Amino acid sequence: MNDETSKLIAKVERFARQEQLFAPAEPGRALHLCAAVSGGADSMALLQVLLELRETFGYPLTACHVNHGLRGETADRDEAFVRAECARLGVPLTVFRPADVGVAVPPHAGEDWARRLRYACFAQLLAGGIDCIATAHTATDQAETLLFRLARGTGLHGAGGIRPKRPGYCRPLLGLTRAETEAVCMARGQRWVTDETNTGDDYARNRLRHAALPALGSVNEAAEENLARFCEKAARADAYFARQAATLLEEAGQRLPPKLPAGARYAREAGEGVWALEPLQKADPLILETALHSLTAPARAAEDR
């Protein structure tokens, strides 16, 4: 392994420690980690990096692969490749197909359906004893996500991009660009496969990847890293506003008058939130907006499911 590759793996290690990606699931028990492996350069680099860091962090490592059944022989080729590579590297592998999670492939299945299928498979693993699914999202994916959301319209939360960690999932490669994951693979003699759907411009993300990012790179070769760094700052700001909003709602809930109007009394008895108006009226508009947004989040999440 050359010095540059060692630096990249050390970069992932620092990021993992900073974000506590591989913290034990519970005291005295190591995190059981599963790498989501498609066969592409990013996911094969993920597997190589996690193998390299396994002794350092002490996690048991397995892998999973989802054959969506959308690309016929090519999808089967990718599955066979991942099976062979995991066997070569000594990493236990679980392979999923739609039927394994009780799903039929719809006539016009696309990217959104494929993503929902993957996360249904991941949920099955998490329910079966896996503590954390490691996905191969990179700084390049982060930059694409930011541009995509800005183009569609987003707020501070959306500008925070892909979070390094959420319950059941971690993204160890968010500090590396796609070029760097390929460099890791080449340095380790690790082959990968190419998903032909990533080469066309049928999908909006592909158009960003093939046109917008190269154009920004011509302005500054560190454009991808800078966009990803902006996401980190936006995520920290979003978390700060969320904490302030929670404090505001707690204060407004505690400052209710002793005798509530009938409607408010019935609402509280029914388990609904009731808040004093004065603290909300005096709040900073951005904090108030965040607080109100948080109150409607469960309903919006239900609509999205």
Where are these regions (language model features)?
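Alpha-helix boundary/capping and short turn/kink residues
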Residues: 152, 156, 217-221, 239, ...
